[in-house]
A protein has these predicted regions:
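Short internal beta-strands
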Residues: 71, 187-192, 338-340, 360-368
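A conserved segment at the C-terminal end of the G1
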Residues: 44, 52-69
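ATP-dependent carboxylate-amine ligase catalytic core
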Residues: 16, 22, 26-39, 63-149, ...
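Extended acidic/charged loop-beta regions that coordinate divalent cations
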Residues: 117-166, 198-242
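Charged, amphipathic alpha-helical linker segments immediately N-terminal to NTP-binding catalytic cores
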Residues: 1-16
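C-terminal helical cap/extension that packs against the catalytic core
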Residues: 194-213, 224-226, 305-312, 318, ...
């Protein structure tokens, strides 16, 4: 099996619907020698911020000379983005070889796309003998394919409404699914709110005798005197001042604080990560497609010698879009040009009505996904009074061309609503993250 054949094999698994449950995953891993049993893992769940926490931890662990594996989803443009060690993505050769092994062991049995990528990640990390795996939950937690490990530390970033069809119609129900990654006597780090979801998390920790370390109580983070720096108060009360923050958005302080609390718990278990490692790791953290700001020069635009300004963000649920709206207040611009695409199963009205009033122009488009909402469906989610500033386009390419044609040097083009859209737009604007 070569790389293209491996991709084709994986892609055809998308036709199997999302399947929540661990029985088939457990049996399959057993046939592969249970690679997960040879790994030291940190399990990262929650509604928003999982990737940011994982990217921060990966950077800090790498700065401390640990071999850190990071498994995340979804990807922006290449499936190989889901698997990396430090800053190195899985090679085409390793991807194809391990996919071939999976196909042989499957022997015609059914597996989902996410079960397959999770299995490949566990195999690769075990084979590469990584020191630590940062394993991001795909959806929920209790029945997620990643929930086959016993981690060193569990993390639940936060809980808000998302994937209601699978996880439940109330915060408490969603929290119950995410609490499924809490293991007996394994510490949990969380920034869950003091609401129904927080009560579920606290109660589950008590039932499983899992030590709970809450942001705002056991540890804290806040903006420093210089807005580009921040302060962390740790589990032992120690203050770390004037910390760097490579990622944009004040909400990233909460995500970084979760990472630092996790680092402290690792140190309590015998790891060796010092303040210098933390500062270096924080300064070098990169997480593409999440409040990612850049300029791009346009041919024939002498009025924009430094290029047009872009901000791309994967916000796709009410809480994520609210965070994006808040972050936009830190940018100066004459006009906000919003390029938006979303999945039809999302809360289109709530998300759009949060951010649409900030925009001078709204360009709706449709990412390439069978779950994508049509531009007309997106327009219908907004009140008729906003129609004069709405433009409908049939492709991401057309949406970007329209946005660039309308934008002036002091405007900001914000692309958001779906990671499918962000991935496609980023690829068109900046090229591939991973060379395909």
């Amino acid at each position: 099996m070569n790389y293209q054949q491996a991709r084709d094999f994986l892609d055809q698994l998308q036709f199997f619907k999302i399947k929540l449950g661990l029985d088939s995953m457990t049996r399959f891993l057993n046939r592969l020698g249970n690679p997960q049993q040879h790994l030291h893992c940190i399990h990262i769940g929650g509604t928003n911020g999982k990737g940011s926490v994982g990217a921060t931890l990966c950077s800090i662990l790498s700065a401390a000379d640990y071999k850190a594996g990071f498994y995340t989803s979804p990807h922006l443009s290449s499936v190989r983005e889901r698997f990396r060690i430090g800053n190195t993505y899985i090679s085409k050769e390793d991807f194809a070889r391990l996919m071939s092994k999976i196909e042989q062991v499957l022997d015609g049995n059914q597996i989902t796309y996410f079960e397959c990528t999770t299995t490949l990640a566990l195999l690769w990390f075990a084979e590469q003998e990584v020191d630590c795996v940062l394993l991001e939950v795909g959806m929920g937690g209790r029945l997620d394919a990643t929930n086959v490990i016993t981690p060193l530390v569990s993390i639940i970033t936060n809980v808000s409404m998302d994937h209601e069809l699978y996880l439940g119609a109330t915060l408490a129900q969603v929290a119950g699914e995410k609490a499924g990654i809490i293991k007996k006597q394994i510490p949990l780090v969380s920034a869950v709110a003091d609401d129904d979801s927080g009560e579920v998390i606290r109660q589950t920790c008590e039932e499983r005798n899992a030590p709970l370390f809450l942001f705002g109580q056991a540890f804290r983070g806040r903006v420093g005197e210089d807005a580009s720096r921040w302060q962390y108060q740790g589990l032992d009360g120690q203050l770390l001042n004037d910390l760097p923050m490579a990622m944009k958005g004040n909400y990233q302080i909460g995500n970084a604080s979760l990472a630092l609390a996790t680092v402290q718990l690792l140190n309590r278990q015998g790891w060796s990560i010092n303040e210098e490692h933390i500062r270096t790791g924080l300064a070098q953290t990169r997480w593409p497609g999440r409040l990612e700001y850049f300029r791009r020069k346009q041919e024939g635009r002498e009025d924009c010698p430094e290029g047009l300004r872009f901000l791309i963000d994967g916000a796709h649920n009410p809480a994520g879009v609210a965070a994006l709206q808040q972050a936009l207040k830190d940018f100066s611009f004459r006009q906000l040009i919003l390029v938006w695409g979303a999945m039809v199963d999302k809360d289109l009205g709530t998300t759009l009505q949060t951010i649409a009033p900030m925009a001078g122009t709204i360009i709706f488009t449709r990412p390439e996904s069978e779950r994508s909402a049509s531009p007309e469906q997106l327009q219908a989610a907004l009140p008729p009074t906003l129609e004069p500033k709405i433009i409908l386009t049939g492709s991401v390419q057309a949406a970007l061309e329209q946005a660039c044609a309308l934008a002036a040097a002091d405007d900001l083009i914000c692309i958001a609503g779906s990671l499918f859209l962000v991935g496609a737009a980023r690829q068109l604007l900046l090229g591939d993250l991973v060379n395909e």
